[in-house]
């Protein structure tokens, strides 16, 4: 009799994805982030569901309902901080996952990569709308500033903004719809993750060498299930340490003040994981130009397969390209720092320089370095 794992219509799908999946024998810990992101997504959905049971999406009670969750609900503080810091964890893992993809040339798996970019945009939209829900000062003003950027779109911009707001300012209608979208999007993300995996399993995973690994595959279970479990333990340790010791480390103190449309905070800024894009947005004095730069700073990921001119897939054996990638990582760190600083000298100039360097490295230096490495290797 055939094993039920291999014959049952539903169980065999899980079997082909997580148990008997042929995986390259040499994938490193950098390949753990996909499964970690899956666990993170499940954690966010579960904690979010419990928060939604006690939250009220109304401007007059939203802030106090979050306070009620933290003070009166059993372990409500834990659920709330797991959800808030889980989002930070999510983005740390996403950025490492993308960095891995760039370093090892995983973007050559075009469908998987493009679905991943769409996923990134969806996750960013979800996180942004989630940040609006507690209805603190930074929630309100962040929503006002970011939604207002759409008014830069020629002709339809102003109407589009009012349509999204559901009125002439960020108000009750905006909060209600943001809650509705924030609730539904994680399930859409889950469906997209399945498509992401479907395309990945069509081609098989990349590996650190960037070479074809069809001649040397091993089953996913037990080798990589145990390896992923170690990753889960590290993630759980990091997240619980953050939640139990410094839950507000990554938050903004302004969000502990209820939203007040008559009082603007001195420095409006998004959560830390958006600061690099926010710095790029602010570095351009023109509104439409800033919005385009903001969108393109993330959309640029789609161009990576076209900008890949090296004869080698991975950067493992390309020290010059490796240096460039680490300079890019340092540059993104500088942009993140600048995004959280006030708009004054010298931060304006540093932000503009870092923004130019960001695009210059990706669009010009990386392709030319690849060509130079080809020449050096006489390829």
Swiss-Prot record:
Pfam families in UniProt: Cytochrom_B_C, Cytochrome_B
One of the record's GO molecular function terms: ubiquinol-cytochrome-c reductase activity
The keyword Mitochondrion is annotated on this UniProt entry: yes
Free-text remark on how the cofactor is bound: Binds 2 heme b groups non-covalently.
GO terms (BP aspect): mitochondrial electron transport, ubiquinol to cytochrome c
PROSITE patterns for the chain: CYTB_CTER, CYTB_NTER
Signal peptide: none
Keyword Transmembrane on entry: yes
Protein residues bound to a ubiquinone: 201
Co-factor(s): heme b
Localization: Mitochondrion inner membrane
Ligand binding (heme b b562): 83, 182
Binding site for heme b b566: 97, 196
GO cellular component: mitochondrial inner membrane; respiratory chain complex III
TM regions (residue ranges): 33-53, 77-98, 113-133, 178-198, 226-246, 288-308, 320-340, 347-367
Domain of life assignment: Eukaryota
Annotated membrane topology: Multi-pass membrane protein
Keywords from the UniProt entry: Electron transport, Heme, Iron, Membrane, Metal-binding, Mitochondrion, Mitochondrion inner membrane, Respiratory chain, Transmembrane, Transmembrane helix, Transport, Ubiquinone
Note from the entry: Heme 1 (or BL or b562) is low-potential and absorbs at about 562 nm, and heme 2 (or BH or b566) is high-potential and absorbs at about 566 nm.
Described purpose of this protein according to its UniProt entry: Component of the ubiquinol-cytochrome c reductase complex (complex III or cytochrome b-c1 complex) that is part of the mitochondrial respiratory chain. The b-c1 complex mediates electron transfer from ubiquinol to cytochrome c. Contributes to the generation of a proton gradient across the mitochondrial membrane that is then used for ATP synthesis.
PANTHER family (UniProt xref): CYTOCHROME B
Family label: Belongs to the cytochrome b family.
Assembly: The cytochrome bc1 complex contains 11 subunits: 3 respiratory subunits (MT-CYB, CYC1 and UQCRFS1), 2 core proteins (UQCRC1 and UQCRC2) and 6 low-molecular weight proteins (UQCRH/QCR6, UQCRB/QCR7, UQCRQ/QCR8, UQCR10/QCR9, UQCR11/QCR10 and a cleavage product of UQCRFS1). This cytochrome bc1 complex then forms a dimer.
Protein name, per record: Cytochrome b
Organism: Spalacopus cyanus
